[in-house]
């Protein structure tokens, strides 16, 4: 991955956190953005948020215009990527893997 893309994704992640924190919706302003993946040319960004509620995605879709407007004003960029929000389930996967490894470790201790 090139340095420019990494820097862009990092900046966008910070700006999105600030944008969400500034919204008047209690559910949205407490969300955590865990990861941002930008396409080439900064036309599209996949935004991973930490939540177990699928209803959050529709709220984020409705607030996308406000979020993009904040990003443009705060960054000074000429354009803001189209944002697609996705629930981040990597924490759940990690917890399941940890549980599996703990079971394996217990099995070895019993041998």
UniProtKB/Swiss-Prot annotation:
Entry-linked Gene3D superfamilies: 3.30.300.20
Cross-referenced InterPro entries: KH_dom-like_a/b, RbfA, RbfA_dom_sf, Ribosome-bd_factorA_CS
PROSITE patterns for this protein: RBFA (PS01319)
GO CC, alphabetical: cytoplasm
GO BP annotations, alphabetical order: maturation of SSU-rRNA
Subunit structure: Monomer. Binds 30S ribosomal subunits, but not 50S ribosomal subunits or 70S ribosomes.
Family assignment from sequence similarity: Belongs to the RbfA family.
Protein name as it appears in the record: Ribosome-binding factor A
Gene from which the chain derives: rbfA
